[in-house]
């Protein structure tokens, strides 16, 4: 049961990440149906026994100010209660299309509704499916066996655009984090792969700069597209596997080709006005990476 149903849950998450506003409800409803499988009823009852969704939503809505995107979800302290609330949220969103629109617009605000839904998927649904599986497999105990402090090291994957690299690196430094840039680290008689593995070993988050440094096309095509360098794509895949997609943010510059295999990875535009900074801060906060919030306001 575990292998099949959890793989099916992950497939629903992947479909949600690729969905548009017309068809996102289908994978969401399928996700809710899978979570309500008979084999999981006792698990779900245990998770939801101490939580009330309406109370949670009311407390969270009270945090909203006049500024769009200001509302913050008021999660409880207990990991099992958090899982229970997320489970109830998914069920309610699958059942009520208007609620899902309003919820995503309020708590996962972005430039349009589908971007808000995708942000909800990557920030809430994907981590829920991961933690839900761990909860079931570890005899209903969501607590990790060992607590370690979260690293302040942020790996920056980059191509040839030095201006973009320095802009992001300076911002990371200003908010009290340590940027890891492979080209600036000593070689120490190591091969590139050895150096990469060592320097990326204890980072907590990765920022991938997809800048138009190369161009290419399929053999059958007469036109070319701007692309990121091959090392950037390799390192993106590495960190998505090592850290999980929720701890990797792609900053895309210009109209460059995004490989279809990376459709489920979160990315935002590296705009000239610094709008990417707000997105990055939001993702760092959700990933649990500690940064200086006071300095972030002026960085």
UniProtKB/Swiss-Prot annotation:
InterPro entries: CAP12/PCTIR_TIR_dom, UCP032620. Keywords: Plasmid. One of its GO terms (molecular function) is NADP+ nucleosidase activity. This is Uncharacterized protein YuaY. It comes from Escherichia coli (strain K12). The gene is yuaY.
């Amino acid at each position: 049961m575990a292998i099949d149903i959890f793989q099916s849950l992950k497939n629903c998450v992947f479909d949600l990440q690729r969905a548009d506003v017309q068809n996102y409800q289908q994978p969401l409803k399928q996700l809710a149906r899978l979570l309500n499988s008979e084999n999981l009823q006792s698990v779900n009852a245990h998770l939801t026994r101490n939580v009330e969704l309406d109370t949670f939503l009311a407390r969270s809505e009270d945090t909203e100010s006049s500024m769009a995107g200001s509302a913050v979800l008021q999660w409880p302290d207990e990991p099992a209660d958090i899982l229970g609330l997320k489970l109830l949220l998914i069920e309610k969103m699958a059942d009520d299309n208007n609620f899902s629109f309003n919820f995503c617009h309020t708590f996962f605000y972005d430039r349009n509704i589908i971007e808000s839904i995708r942000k909800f998927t990557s920030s809430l649904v994907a981590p829920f499916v991961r933690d839900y599986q761990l909860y079931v497999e570890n005899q209903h105990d969501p607590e990790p066996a060992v607590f370690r402090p979260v690293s302040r090291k942020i790996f920056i994957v980059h191509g040839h655009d030095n201006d973009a690299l320095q802009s992001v690196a300076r911002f990371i430094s200003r908010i009290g984090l340590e940027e890891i840039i492979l080209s600036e680290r000593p070689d120490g008689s190591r091969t590139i792969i050895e150096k990469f593995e060592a320097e990326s070993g204890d980072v907590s988050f990765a920022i991938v700069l997809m800048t138009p440094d190369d161009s290419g096309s399929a053999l059958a095509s007469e036109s070319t597209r701007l692309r990121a360098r091959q090392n950037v794509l390799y390192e993106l895949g590495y960190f998505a596997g090592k850290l999980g997609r929720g701890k990797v943010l792609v900053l895309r510059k210009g109209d460059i080709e995004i490989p279809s295999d990376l459709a489920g990875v979160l990315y935002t535009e590296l705009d000239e006005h610094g709008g990417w900074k707000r997105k990055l801060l939001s993702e760092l906060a959700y990933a649990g990476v500690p940064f200086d919030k006071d300095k972030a306001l002026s960085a």
